[in-house]
Structure formats: C-alpha cells, structure tokens
Amino acid sequence: VAIVPDVFGGAEGVLGADGLGDKRVNIDFKNDQISILRSTGPVRANGFTRIPVKLRYGHLLMFDVTLAGVRPRAMLDTGAQSTIGNSSLRAALARRKRQGVENIIIGVTLDAQKGETLLAPAVELGDLTLRGMQVTFGDMYIFEAWKMTDTPALLIGMDIIGLLDSLIIDYKRRELHLRAPR
C-alpha cells in the first residue's frame, strides 16, 4: 500500500497498488499533480532516467543502485516517509567510519524502531546521482518481512523521492522513470 503524502496539496491518502498491474502512475512533484493511466506503450519522456524494475510481492519495486561501490537491493516506497537501510548495508559501508545520530523510525503500524541516521555516500541510479541523502540504518521489521536481512538493502522513501521533479512508475512495462530538478 502506498501513501500519497501532503505534497499534493492536502490530498493525503492510501493508494492501493494491487490494481496497478497494467497502469502507469505519473507523479509531478513540481506541479503537485498525480495521474494514473493505462500503460499503452513506451514512455517517451525527455530528461528522464529510465530504470528497469522487478516486481516482488506483486507491487514492490526493486531496482539496482550503487552506494560507494556497494550494490544493495533497492526498493521504492512512496508510503515511507524516510529512507532506511538494513544493518547489512551499514556493515558493507562500515569502512567509512562515520558516526551517525540515533533516530526513531515509526512504521505504518505505529511501531517505533531505533536506527542510526547518517549522511550516505552518493547513490547512483542509472545515470542519475543523488547526493546528500540521509539514511537511517537498523534492523527494521520491514527488511525481515521481505527476507532482506542478510544482504544489503535500501528502501528509498519520500524524503528522497519528493526531491525529484517527476516520477513515473510503469507497472506493466516494469520501468521507473525519474527526472531530477533542473
């Protein structure tokens, strides 16, 4: 289940992903617009980075990223307020001896979990590089539920997604299209 946050002018609510199998979701953060259309062909979008995705559990978007030479399993979660990484990713990045700040992550069920928040190395998504993002690392329940505790994993939340100008999720074609601010 995805949550459309308040960036859409107060249109906060739950968007069920189960019915999106043949759809394309266009989110224009710059103009506070969202549209859900039938996916009828390739996205012809100038200025976008195209990233192939795999769907897990029917709607969880998984794709390749690189952080300081580490290639974690990455997921996009429009229902997550913050970006989180599992302890395996933190260990893989441990050669960077940065000290983080203890933080609390509150899940959709209002369970609170402790983590360590720190500035992550640049994240490469295709030909797009994101810098200066904060990630909270820890043994979060979501990684256990998705059986991703033993391998580095990163869940990219709205703190990062919302910095983009636009995002297109094409469930039928299994593609993610990102446009960075100009």
Predicted regions and their residues:
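Pepsin/retropepsin-fold aspartyl endopeptidases
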Residues: 1-182
